Amino acid sequence: MEHVLPGQAPIRDFVHHNTLHGFQHLPFAAALEEAERLTGIRGYLPENEFRALHRKGRIDDADIDTVLDRHLGAAGEEILAVAGGEPVTRRQIHRLRLTVDLEPVDPARFTWLVDELEALDRFDPEVSPEARRRLMESAKRGRGEAVASRRLVRDLWDACLERLGLGDYTASHPEDLLGHAIAHAEALYADFKAESSGGGLSVSHRAMREEARALLAEEIDAVGREQTLRGFILKLTGQDVLDRVRPQLIRHCASHLDEGLAAWHSPDRSLGFYAAWKRSMRHGAEGGLGEVPLGHAELDALPDDPAEVVVFELEQRGIPLPYWEGYLERLALELPGWSGMMNWRAHRPLYRANRTAPVSLMDYLAVRLILDRRYLGRICSETWGIGGHIGELARYFEAHLSEFVVRHALYCGDLPEFLAATCADLVRRAGCERVDRKPWRVAADMIFSWRHAPGAGRDLRIRLHGSGWRLFKLAQHLGLSAHDVQALSASEIERLLCALDELTPAQRGYLWLCAYERHYREPLFNALASNHGRGRWATRDERPQAQIVFCMDDREEGVRRHLEELNPAVETLGAAGFFGIPMYWQGLDDAEPSALCPIVVIPSHEVREVPRPGEEAARRLHDHRRGVVRLLGRVFNQEIRRNLLSSHLLIDLVAPGVAVGLIAKVLLPRWAATLSRWLADLWMPEVPTTLALHAADDAAPAGPEQPRPGLTDAEQADRVAAFLLNIGLTQGFAPIVVLMGHGSASRNNPHLAAYDCGACSGRHGGPNARVFAAMANRPQVREQLAQRGLVVPADTWFVGAEHNTCSEEITWFDVQDIPPLSRIGWHAFAAQLDEACRLSAQERCRRFASAPRRPSPARALRHVSTRSVDFSQARPELGHATNAAALIGRRSVSRGLFLDRRVFLISYDPTRDPEGRILEGILLAAGPVGAGINLEYYFSTVNNERHGCGSKVAHNVTGLFGIMEGAASDLRTGLPRQMAEVHEAMRLQVVVEQTPEILAAIYRRQPPIRELVGNGWILLSAIDPGDGTISVFDPERGFVPWAGAATDMALCGRSTDWFEGHVEPLAPALIAV
């Protein structure tokens, strides 16, 4: 079941991942179709949004033509009809099907289009000028004179209906058509009465029963495969049992999973969810006061083993054994957030919260099934006087088919108002068919006759508002006049209309996506080809003034670019932000260690932050005062909510201060944050710290099961050497080498971890940078590196730092250890980095709606800094929004390009990796990280309400592990709308500087890479290290040369010249180097 449930961790440990991780073994398009079949969630942007992107120029005609040619091949040139002397090909029809809304319309919308927009007298607004011209010229030739556009369009409509044999309805107002259905239904019912007066059943009634019997069998068979009993009952009563179950179930789930928000906890949490629930129902008020109380005898009868409960409940419902798995899967998907969290915790028994509250998905399903049975049984008993067994329901409705028809049509169908009102009144008055059979039979026969009435109901909608409307719009966009339509043969019209449905909605979505991706990919490839040979540091012939290794994060692309523009002698590199140091980290104030590494890695070592020698007294004072702050926090956050006496006193006491603080946060957030930071520093002065990272050479072996404090000299040298080799930094070391981790800081932001470093399990990467620098500076490590042929000059000093991607602040670590000779160079570099951050803030402001237009760098920095401390700000930063590509290679490939902060930059030197072994490791480590980020943003963008978690405005934090909307919603997973609203939903385009042959060999060797690349979850291309030629990977053909060609590009003196004044995504541009 894990493959269909959300795999999101608790929100404090948020790590980006593929939302459809359970379908990753399938090709991308097939996976989206299978997920939609199972969950009903579409995996592409709505077509109207794609069409809006086409109108804006984010997708152009060449993109659409290219993907259609690839999809159709030679079949696209097949001639379907000859109209107006011109052939109409399948490719033309498919192209119009993509770019124009050619869906059938329902009668109500048709009425609105005719009455309000005069759709039968005016051209479709989206008809191109060329098509209008052809249409008007054709009409003039056909009539021998010019025709007014209103008359021309009306004639076209009449001609379409005439060719489809619908001419009888051209003069009728759509609302009048309802009268045909009513009259026909009444006539059929009169026949029924006449035929049945002789004691038999009418022909129409017998037909209705046969149709009903088939539908009933279909619905019964779907229980366990496509729906649960809840869905079946919902279709027949309009009552959703989940509305009654959800509040009770969620209350218990939230209490059991709580990680620190609740003031009280159940004393039985350690027994597991099911056992704790049973005890709560027995001893708590809810067991006796619930809407459907569970008595002690019934609770005692329940097995202690939740698995036995699940088996018992499924048998009680009459679900066939082969359908059990599907039934439980459907049941879990009715509340996927809560089911997914239970499942996530169940698969991670070592998770810290499981120590006091173990979790099992079987526990959850057992409780859900018990509650379902109680409420389903009540509905069935009150409505039909039977239990909630699928067999009883089947037998009842087999004997009362008329009632089944009426109820199913009322709650699932699209009945006209006169029939819906009749059926609703019947359900309300009669209750069920066993009370009075006649009115149910009358209503069922009327429904049947309405559905099968010629010229009315569904038949008319399919033909008039379907074929007629679609042919009418299609003719306009093809430039066909009434004369041209009348000249078409019946077979030609049929071929044209059939061609409109040859592309399924999923296929159209995939074609649009491919066109969207191509529109981004072609300028990117053009930029890389045009930039070949321009960038510095391809060979590092001269020594850089400074080197800085950033995380591969796309948000760092802008800072790197601005820094290089400020000082071309600086070399920037990129890598996964844990810097090759997987570890458990425990900061000075941390209660327990946290893993700082990719989520798939389990660390074997632990590193602690400790006070520097001589700072013991400062540490004791710090701990004492921090203890006071924590005590006050517990009193304010929990005691005030649970103690009757103290809550009254404390509320009166703290209310004035809270009011003043709230006003300051709202009106003066920057000033309030500064004051708060000053008071915190005054009360708890910072303790100078160092790292406890060394372990003796004879220390016990380290492993994931028994993490060991510290690393030996050899282990430290192993990690430093491997990382430097991976990024290609094995010679040409600068005097200052900075390791720049990153994190994000903002207020009132439950999704804070989603802005942090994905390579550090959703936490800050500064500690990893600090640890790496400390290791690389140790003489013992340098000595071992030299023995391995990796010589680091004596005057090179590594410095750890952390970049706040929200406020653009830089935090430096252990600067007091920088040697005096290196300190001058570090000061100069730090000043340049600060200026680069100001320029980065200026670039970011162009995408914020509330930011000043064209701000100076200093003003832009103030703005982003204020956003980071404004607790009312729903968009403190935009995170990874707009990420679209990853570039693995030397910085010379991309240096000198404006990439709009959309590209993950990962350093790799192909000239030092002839067999691709280093690249193989990079792809295995960084590939899933980049793909996880990209795919989570993709799915949260295409359907934010289902794959994402909706707007932050309605979110409530639940138990410090998740968010809900209100107090009784599902647990929301994915990204909030404010994080994804500017994102362009497309798959990650990975470009690797290496030969296609080496990449193909890696692809064949590594199943994880084959799954991601071969199934199309990410897109792979190669750029040759020698001549810069680009090859694109096709899962069916392998690497094929890029079909495009380098064209002239804009050349700018600096990035500001390109982005200033623009708020939209920008294409790459060349920057002077």
Swiss-Prot record:
What does this protein need as cofactor? Answer: Zn(2+)
Q: Does the keyword Cell membrane apply?
A: yes
CC annotations in GO: plasma membrane
Location in or out of the cell? Cell inner membrane
InterPro entries under this entry?
DabA
Q: Where is the signal peptide?
A: none
Listed binding positions for Zn(2+) are: C551, D553, H742, C757
* Pfam families in alphabetical order: DabA
Coarse class of the protein's main subcellular location: membrane
PANTHER family from the xrefs?
INORGANIC CARBON TRANSPORTER SUBUNIT DABA-RELATED (PTHR38344:SF1), UPF0753 PROTEIN AQ_863 (PTHR38344)
**What is the protein's quaternary organization?**
Forms a complex with DabB.
Protein name (Swiss-Prot/TrEMBL)? Probable inorganic carbon transporter subunit DabA
Q: Which gene encodes it?
A: dabA
